[in-house]
């Protein structure tokens, strides 16, 4: 059994479905004693893991389901060597919400100096990358950056009373103020190995 918990959210992994069903049942009964219940939409049992894809393929079923946890959609995949990997992409709903907030702020700052807006955007984007720049998520973050460039371009073109700036004129501005994404975190196994190296994993 593997459990990852943060605040009141948790993910539990089991080798056998019966064990997962037993824990869910016990958990529901425990909460009911206090007049509580699990979230009906967020609580579910799914087949996930190293053998999920092959087992489902044998049964004529589709790809393993995904789940969202701590702002990431987790899904089964493989790396360049064909080894099983749990990939994480920024949850689409979460990214749309962030982009909407930034877009609104860009409109509000329409007539502020470019350097002021750019410095603000850079801080926002770097902070976003600090959390979301995990292995396998760069394509999503690249789309995030591309969307921001479009939003800012729209604002800059609207405030110009003369010639509307084109992409060639705006690209250097975007390159200066909106950093391109790069992976900032190792895969979880690397961090875990660094913490337990030289010690028993059973401690």
Q: What does each model-found stretch correspond to?
A:
Residues 1-203:
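Non-catalytic terminal/accessory segments
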């Amino acid at each position: 059994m593997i459990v990852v918990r943060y605040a009141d959210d948790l993910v539990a992994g089991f080798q056998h479905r019966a064990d997962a069903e037993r824990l869910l049942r016990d958990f529901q009964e425990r909460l009911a004693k206090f007049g509580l219940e699990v979230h009906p939409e967020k609580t579910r049992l799914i087949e996930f893991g190293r053998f999920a894809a092959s087992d489902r393929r044998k049964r004529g079923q589709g790809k393993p389901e995904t789940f969202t946890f701590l702002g990431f959609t987790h899904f089964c995949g493989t790396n360049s060597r064909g080894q099983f990997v749990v990939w994480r992409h920024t949850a689409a709903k979460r990214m749309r919400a962030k982009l909407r907030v930034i877009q609104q702020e860009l409109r509000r700052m329409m007539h502020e100096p470019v350097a002021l807006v750019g410095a603000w955007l850079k801080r926002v984007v770097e902070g976003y990358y600090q959390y979301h720049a995990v292995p396998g998520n760069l394509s999503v973050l690249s789309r995030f950056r591309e969307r921001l460039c479009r939003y800012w371009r729209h604002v800059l073109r609207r405030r110009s009373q003369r010639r509307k700036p084109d992409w060639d004129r705006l690209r250097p501005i975007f390159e200066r103020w909106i950093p391109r994404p790069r992976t900032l975190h190792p895969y979880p196994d690397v961090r875990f190995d660094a913490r337990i190296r030289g010690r028993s994993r059973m401690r």
